[in-house]
Curated annotation (Swiss-Prot):
Residues 482-516, 543-585 are annotated as: Disordered. RNA-binding protein involved in pre-mRNA splicing. Interacts with the PRP19C/Prp19 complex/NTC/Nineteen complex which is part of the spliceosome. Involved in regulating splice site selection. Binds preferentially RNA with A/C rich sequences and poly-C stretches. Belongs to the KHDC4 family. Its main location: nucleus. This is KH homology domain-containing protein 4.
Length: 585
């Protein structure tokens, strides 16, 4: 096809005249593009200007130049390639490539270590969505650098290896501060959640921010904001648990760790420049997030701007805790060693009380020394000691009663209970003795009320002298002689009325002659005495009773106090005497 023909296709090859029009040093219109190639737009523009005769490839060159310029700008902005010197001298789009280079030199970089934060918090900070949110909020770029390392791996860390941290960079310090504060809030919330959950694997959030100042630039105004950025920096943090949660209550753990007036912790702060204080249960430190003490056991919180200072403060705190533990062990050993001695000192006091006399007489005997209340004495111990003292009585006993005379009580045919007189040494309870004394003291009143024997019949039926002789014989058997008893019996016979049978009338003069020497006043007194003594156990009088009394005289003298009485058959067989008319009731 000739050059003057009509329409041409883009596939048409240019003729020789067109090749002669190409200037030396001008790049071809279509060149292969590589990632590292750098196309200069001025050269492309010069080629377009010199190839005015060739109108076919002009559109393709413009498109290639535009694409190359865009790609070069993107690569320069990302730092993948560096612009050449001739390109900077022939800038047709002023301000783009030099602006990118200038922004890279003035970037403020900060690093936040998140290797030791709780797992949930670490996972949240390494997520791309969280980092994009922080970048949009602050305007600074956030990226993850390093890798997670355990304590053993940290000890064996290489020169080019670093623990996990966040890389923050921005145009100004304000943007970086904003991003760092947001990261701090996320870490703080994660620490509070971990403390609430009492995670045993959490050793405290160790957050370190390193501020990398910009290289030396002619602008000096960037230096003054440096202290402001450092004021918001995080410190390297760590904690040491005290480990005395179950200590004895008398051992004040907080005071032992802090020292007098917190002197121990203040000494560590002065030596290392770190911030050291107690936190956790029983520390008295109120957490700002929860408004109360932390749920964790008591621990020492340490923070320092540099890892070296943190290590020095941690070592001093470990030495302090070792001293506190040793002191607590000595305290516990002292308590366990003194406990048996304290318990052994008590038995001498108890034995001293038991050495006091345990018996006290019931009559209120007072000793010469203060009386110590002894334990309740056994009943068997009190019996042999009662013999020594008589029992006081509010009413004196009758004069005829001899307390130390023991005599058996005869069985009388009466319905009244017969008091038994026993020596005080054999009477155990006091109340029965009082009842006996009251009973014997009431007997004279009963005898006085029936002095003459007029109960329900005549005198010779009620005042015979053969009835109640228990008390009188018991009282006077040991004192009176046998002759006195015989005389009293004869007087009783003389004072009795004349019997109704002739036999008794014949014996009456003999009895009167035997007792004729007695006076009338003496007879009356004896009669009153005998009637007062003989009120119980009355027996009917018979004419022939004198013979029976003589037959039983020996028994009456020797054994009347032993409870002798006439057989009931003889008493029932005796006929009743006829009563004179003048003695009828």
């Amino acid at each position: 096809m000739s050059a003057g023909s009509g329409r041409r296709s883009k596939w048409d090859q240019p003729g020789p005249p067109t090749t002669t029009l190409l200037l030396p040093g001008v790049i071809p219109a279509i060149i292969p593009f590589t990632a590292g190639a750098f196309l200069s737009p001025p050269e492309i523009a010069a080629a377009d200007a010199t190839s005015e005769a060739v109108s076919a490839p002009s559109g393709a060159l413009d498109a290639a130049a535009a694409v190359a310029a865009k790609i070069n700008a993107m690569l320069v902005a990302k730092g993948k390639i560096k612009p050449s010197q001739n390109a900077t001298e022939k800038v047709h789009v002023p301000g783009k490539a030099p602006a990118a280079a200038k922004s890279k030199d003035d970037l403020v970089v900060a690093e936040v270590e998140i290797n030791d934060v709780p797992l949930t918090c670490r996972n949240l900070l390494t997520r791309g969505q969280t980092q994009d949110e922080i970048s949009r909020m602050s305007g600074a770029a956030v990226s993850t650098r390093g890798r997670y390392m355990t304590a053993e791996e940290k000890a064996k860390i290489g020169p080019g290896d670093r623990p996990l941290y966040l890389h923050v960079q921005g145009q100004t310090r304000e943007l970086v501060d904003r991003a760092v504060n947001r990261i701090k809030e996320i870490i703080t919330s994660g620490v509070v959640k971990a403390a609430t959950g009492s995670s045993p694997t959490f050793n405290g959030a160790t957050v370190t921010v390193y501020h990398q100042p910009a290289p030396v630039t002619p602008v000096v105004s960037a230096a003054p904001p440096k202290p402001q950025f450092q004021s918001g920096m995080h410190y390297v943090q760590d904690k040491l648990f005290v480990g005395l949660e179950h200590a004895v209550a008398t051992f004040n753990v907080k005071e032992k760790v802090e020292g007098p007036g917190c002197s121990y912790l203040q000494h560590i702060q002065m030596e290392t420049g770190a911030k050291v204080f107690l936190r956790g249960k029983g520390s008295g430190c109120i957490e700002p997030a929860s408004g109360r003490e932390a749920f964790e056991p008591m621990y020492i919180y340490i923070s320092h701007p540099k890892p070296e200072g943190l290590a020095a403060a941690k070592k001093l705190c470990e030495n302090l805790l070792q001293t506190v533990h040793a002191e607590y062990n000595r305290f516990v050993n002292q308590i366990t060693s003194t406990a048996p001695m304290t318990g052994y000192a008590q038995p001498p006091q108890i034995s001293s009380v038991s050495m006091q006399p345990q018996y006290y007489p019931p009559n209120g005997y007072q000793t010469g020394f203060p009386v110590v209340q002894p334990p309740a004495p056994q009943p068997a111990v009190q019996v042999p000691y009662v013999v020594s003292t008589p029992i006081a009585s509010p009413v004196p006993p009758p004069p005829g009663v001899v307390p130390n005379m023991a005599a058996p009580v005869p069985a009388v045919p009466t319905c009244y209970p017969i008091p038994q007189v026993q020596p005080p040494g054999l009477s155990l309870p006091v109340p029965p003795q009082g009842q006996k004394r009251r009973f014997t003291e009431e007997l004279p009143e009963e005898r006085d009320s029936r002095l003459l024997g007029y109960q329900h019949g005549p005198i010779h039926m009620t005042n015979l002298g053969t009835g109640f002789l228990v008390q009188s014989k018991m009282d006077g058997a040991s004192v009176r002689s046998d002759t006195v008893v015989v005389k009293e019996r004869e007087r009783d016979r003389q004072l009795m009325p004349p019997p109704g049978f002739p036999v008794s009338a014949q014996k009456e003069p003999e009895e009167k002659s035997a007792a004729g020497t007695l006076g009338v006043a003496e007879d009356n007194s004896i009669k009153k005495l005998k009637t007062s003594d003989k009120t119980f156990g009355l027996v009917a009088y018979a004419g022939d009773s004198s013979d029976e009394e003589e037959d039983h005289g020996v028994l009456k003298n020797s054994g009347w106090s032993a409870g002798y009485q006439y057989p009931a058959s003889q008493q029932q067989q005796r006929p009743k005497p006829q009563m004179p008319f003048w003695m009828a009731p």
